[in-house]
Amino acid sequence: MSMSDPIADMLTRIRNAQMVEKTSVAMPSSKLKSAIAQVLKDEGYIDGFAVKTTDGKSQLEISLKYYAGRPVIERIERVSRPGLRIYKGRHDIPTVMNGLGVAIVTTPQGVMTDRKARAAGIGGEVLCYVA
């Protein structure tokens, strides 16, 4: 059976793994998931990630990050979903927690943070909020 929302599944796996203090979490890989993981790494929310292939299936393994025994990601929530896509123009891209968090946006120039999208003057689909 196919998954209806693989991005929500990825975010839920990260959230659940951090609740039980796992050091890493694995999930089926895709280009979009790898791009989201790259943004999380660049913003300092995860230690790193790797794509591993076994038996023709690629797995994305994310190394989770903790500070003083607490997860670095306090909140990770899906915004745009298959049943209700959320698109924002360059002037309407939201800030998360007054700039303390990031909104991950997929644009014609790739997946990036809300700050980079605003600086580039482009809008897109708001995938999730991370704080």
From Swiss-Prot:
Pfam families linked to this entry: Ribosomal_S8
SUPFAM superfamilies: Ribosomal protein S8
Keyword Cell division: no
Gene3D superfamilies registered for this protein in UniProt: 3.30.1370.30, 3.30.1490.10
GO CC, alphabetical: ribonucleoprotein complex; ribosome
Annotated GO MF terms: rRNA binding; structural constituent of ribosome
Keywords associated with the record: Ribonucleoprotein, Ribosomal protein, RNA-binding, rRNA-binding
GO biological process: translation
Protein's UniProt keywords contain Metal-binding: no
Superkingdom as given in the UniProt entry: Bacteria
Assembly and binders: Part of the 30S ribosomal subunit. Contacts proteins S5 and S12.
Family: Belongs to the universal ribosomal protein uS8 family.
Stated role: One of the primary rRNA binding proteins, it binds directly to 16S rRNA central domain where it helps coordinate assembly of the platform of the 30S subunit.
Name this protein carries in UniProt: Small ribosomal subunit protein uS8
Organism in which the protein naturally occurs: Leptothrix cholodnii (strain ATCC 51168 / LMG 8142 / SP-6)
